[in-house]
């Protein structure tokens, strides 16, 4: 009776490449319309003002401006893009 399992090379030895998820633009950074802000699985972050959500929950900028992160209801974090001309008025 063998005391070691033979090889196993055909069963093991596979792994998938990383999916490159995460935040791509951080708070205060300038976003151009269409820029991806976050790639995620599920809704870790939620879209706020001037931010859209794709089929795969990717958040992207709808207008040019600066990225902001804010805590909201139910402990959700909302990502918004504040237009540059609106920030100058504040």
From Swiss-Prot:
<dbReference type="Pfam" id="PF01016">
    <property type="entry name" value="Ribosomal_L27"/>
</dbReference>
<dbReference type="GO" id="GO:0003735">
    <property type="term" value="F:structural constituent of ribosome"/>
</dbReference>
<dbReference type="GO" id="GO:0006412">
    <property type="term" value="P:translation"/>
</dbReference>
<dbReference type="GO" id="GO:0022625">
    <property type="term" value="C:cytosolic large ribosomal subunit"/>
</dbReference>
<keyword id="KW-0687">Ribonucleoprotein</keyword>
<protein>
    <recommendedName>
        <fullName>Large ribosomal subunit protein bL27</fullName>
    </recommendedName>
</protein>
<comment type="similarity">
    <text>Belongs to the bacterial ribosomal protein bL27 family.</text>
</comment>
<dbReference type="InterPro" id="IPR001684">
    <property type="entry name" value="Ribosomal_bL27"/>
</dbReference>
<keyword id="KW-0689">Ribosomal protein</keyword>
<dbReference type="InterPro" id="IPR018261">
    <property type="entry name" value="Ribosomal_bL27_CS"/>
</dbReference>
């Amino acid at each position: 009776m063998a005391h070691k399992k033979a090889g196993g090379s055909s069963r093991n030895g596979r792994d998938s490449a990383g999916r490159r998820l995460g935040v791509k633009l951080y708070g205060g950074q300038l976003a151009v319309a269409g820029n991806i802000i976050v790639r995620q699985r599920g809704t870790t972050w939620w879209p706020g003002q001037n931010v859209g959500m794709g089929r795969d929950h990717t958040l992207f900028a709808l207008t040019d401006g600066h990225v902001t992160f804010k805590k909201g209801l139910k402990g959700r974090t909302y990502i918004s893009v504040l237009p540059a001309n609106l920030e100058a008025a504040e």
